[in-house]
Amino acid sequence: MKLSTADSIFFFLPYEFINPIILLIPMATIIFAGRSNVGKSTLIYRLTGKKVRRGKRPGVTRKIIEIEWKNHKIIDMPGFGFMMGLPKEVQERIKDEIVHFIEDNAKNIDVAVLVVDGKAAPEIIKRWEKRGEIPIDVEFYQFLRELDIPTIVAVNKLDKIKNVQEVINFLAEKFEVPLSEIDKVFIPISAKFGDNIERLKNRIFEVIRERQGRRV
């Protein structure tokens, strides 16, 4: 699956900022990725008002889904990691498809939103490290950065986290994010209740402007 560079229109800005240069800026492409069952599809609904197939069973979203939102393209990637009811070889194939899609389209992706379960992530990361393995969330973040894709980490399930800053500091250490960048990279949210959604939305558009500004 290849993104079309022909899908090009300017992104929304206040009227007074629109000029001929802005008209040349391609439509923004935003990908949402994360483990299965971290609230990715719920978050997309909170941001766009558009429903994508979601449910309580891990791995409900198994195909790449594209959504048009305010003249931007939202891409909901299948959840990676454990997928209930699917053979391991199918899970690996889906993971490979995600990797190949992102590699093939890296230059056209303006921002990636990596959604993590703020309550479960620390324990999952510790468990993987105890086995001597690189945690999949950490590996995926590094993969996105190696492709030079600006990445925001949406730390979901804020309503279930006792010490939010402690969790963010832990993730920042594991993701190797400098102290000066923590507030730009990690946005604690609750997709279920809508907490901090506007902050995340503002950060997404800020990154888009920075990314596309370098292309002009």
UniProtKB/Swiss-Prot annotation:
Cofactor: Mg(2+)
Coiled coil regions, renumbered to chain: none
Family matches, as InterPro entries: G_ENGB_dom, GTP-bd, GTP-bd_ribosome_bio_YsxC, P-loop_NTPase, Small_GTP-bd
CDD domains, per the entry: YihA_EngB
Keywords from the named record: Cell cycle, Cell division, GTP-binding, Magnesium, Metal-binding, Nucleotide-binding, Septation
Binding site for Mg(2+): 41, 61
GO MF: GTP binding; metal ion binding
Database matches in HAMAP family: GTPase_EngB
Role description: Necessary for normal cell division and for the maintenance of normal septation.
Official protein name in the record: Probable GTP-binding protein EngB
